Amino acid sequence: IVARIVEKKKATLTIGGAVFAGVVTAPWIIMLVNATLGTAFNFHLPVAVMMACLSIGYTFGESLGRLACLSFGCCYGKPLSQCTGHARKLFEHFNVVFTGETKKVAYASGLAGEKMIPIQIITAVIYAISGLVGTLLFLRGFAGIALVETLVVTQVWRVVSEFFRADFRGE
């Protein structure tokens, strides 16, 4: 529904939408499995533990996915020419330049050859660290905290990173 409003497309699916649907439905599915198969076969899946596993896996998956974005040239950051002050100074020596006409940054925005904020790399690192922290918490018996940590980091960064991105996803 959100993608339909933002992108103005009648039939579209997004990763963000799938994550939202998964977070909302997964606990109910786990409880249904517990009530049916769990009762029949005498087992119980703790909801928080299963949700933590899903969230940690999602976090690592998104981290690896950003590397695919880097390769394809999508989900790109703003060009440094559009940045001012601290952001421009910080990314002057830490940026990415895309080349090749098959990169999305080239054919969608005409920004090939420009120094860009390396948002894909930053996101990959933040998510990988979050996944590792979540895994450590999980292995130490703090599944609930691992769930909250990975969900908060990925979703807060998803919002914050939008301020550093230049790719337009609506139309």
Protein language model regions, located:
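Hydrophobic, membrane-interfacing alpha helices
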Residues: 1-171
